């Protein structure tokens, strides 16, 4: 899987943007071994979730996230397919995931985070306040995070459809790359068999001169 090109794919970037604006979550890719293949810590990488942005800005927050992600991966590799929802270590905050399956083989996963089911509960606000204080986030950012999670749409079916669309685009991209590589390989093989030295035909005077020299060399014992 060409993760570098995949992360820059126009249609995937647009779907990530829609997921970010509608659901205030970020979309992350894992490879078949559960390693993160989205460079969300890079300075120029756009994060749509204020919660996630604040979480990964803190060492303890990143440790929490990596631990949760490992648990999610271990659950994902044992599922047959479809959209899966797994809880994080924080109450009400979840992962929405889908395996990337190509020719019956898991090539990686798409992970949406964070998704909140009960975003109107008072306990959520307390949770965010406690976590952000632990991560040393200022009060303005805390309030912004609470607001972003509270306005997040709870329409799970739309979210599932979008995550599924991301996975389909990833597999389509992978298929096209594989087909292109196979065509190049076949073409190289065909050209190799058709244009050997003895079948090469050159009509220019210089090419004919080279052929005559090559024939002399090829027939000599040296």
Predicted segment positions?
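Structured interaction and signal-relay segments at domain junctions
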Residues: 3-8, 12-92
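Residue-level signal for well-ordered, solvent-exposed loop/turn and beta-edge residues enriched
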Residues: 35, 104-105
